[in-house]
Design a protein with these regions (language model features):
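Extreme N-terminal starter segment of soluble prokaryotic enzymes
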Residues: 1-4
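Short Gly/Pro-enriched turn/cap motifs at secondary-structure boundaries
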Residues: 9-11
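Short acidic loop-to-helix transition motifs that present clustered carboxylates
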Residues: 13, 69-70, 113
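Pre-active-site segment of Zn-dependent metallo-hydrolases
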Residues: 13-16, 25-64, 76-77, 81-82, ...
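Short, well-ordered beta-strand micro-motif
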Residues: 20-22
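Hydrophobic alpha-helical bundles that form the membrane domains of multi-pass transporters
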Residues: 66-74
Length: 113
């Protein structure tokens, strides 16, 4: 039973981090962020990860290292049944950000501490 590490995005840039740790029975994503740019018109490319943003596979949880947008910016793309984990401060800031950008109906208290 081996441990696998997959970097989905973030090896050739600052920001837009998404990595995954998995075994034969468990899959955990670490961060799901937006890419960074100095261009004010830049829009981060949607990050599509099978089992996380669609139903082609499964994911047990997503762990957020901290609340910066380059680590949490694509949180709302994560399937709602996947558990989200973050520290107390990160959770609070992520909920405030979700309410600001999407309204309270999308900002569910899904994060666990």
């Amino acid at each position: 039973m081996g441990l696998k590490l997959c970097i989905h995005r973030g090896t050739h840039q600052i920001g837009g981090i998404a990595a995954e740790i998995s075994t034969a029975t468990t899959r955990i994503l670490i961060d799901m962020g937006d890419e960074l740019s100095l261009d004010p018109n830049f829009v981060s490319a949607p990050l599509n990860i099978p089992g996380v943003t669609d139903t082609d596979g499964c994911c047990d949880a997503v762990l957020f290292t901290h609340y910066h947008g380059d680590h949490t910016g694509q949180t709302l793309r994560i399937r709602p049944e996947i558990s989200l984990y973050a520290g107390a401060l990160a959770k609070e800031i992520m909920l405030i950000s979700a309410r600001h950008w999407c309204g309270p109906y999308r900002a569910k208290s899904r994060c666990r501490r």
